[in-house]
Amino acid sequence: MGTITVGTENSVDIDLHYEDKGSGQPIVLIHGFPLDGNSWEGQTPALLEAGYRVITYDRRGFGQSSQPSTGYDYDTFADDLHTVLETLDLHDVILVGFSMGTGEIARYIGRHGEDRLAKVAFLASLEPFLAITDDNPDGAGRDRAGGHVHPSFLACSRPRLAWGTNVL
């Protein structure tokens, strides 16, 4: 339906393809890896029928959006989401993320706050990395990062976490 420019690379615009349908309270659907905004086509009709304004977009590097050589980190994804919300002048927004999209929502809230948001939904969410590291200086100490999680869960999650880390 349209594009939103979120930056430039080598004097070329970085554009995100988006679709904006319906009216009412806006709900922004954020796809997972390696999908695009079309992955929500099964949910969109019901949301439109329920009276929502439904916005989907292809994250940079996915679908019909630009494929720049940089910017594939959650800070940039969150900033791109912020540009989408600002450009479309969205308020009282419901953000729904699937898989990788949940990390984008979490980072968005951390970087840009909740002023534009009414609700968020995390579907098939990524496990957060809680421990303090060089690239996560605000995390919890290692003695606390897993303190509320049963050791058997951590043991069975390690292969999944390792796989997810390698994919992203």
Language-model-detected regions and their locations in the chain:
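Short beta-strand immediately N-terminal to the catalytic nucleophile in serine-hydrolase-like folds
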Residues: L95-G97, L123
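Flexible "cap/lid" loop of the alpha/beta hydrolase fold
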Residues: A106-A155
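Gly/Ala-rich beta-loop-alpha elbow adjacent to hydrolase catalytic centers
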Residues: G97, G101, I105
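Structural signature of beta-strand start/N-cap positions in the alpha/beta core
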Residues: P26, G51-R53, H91-I94, R116-K119
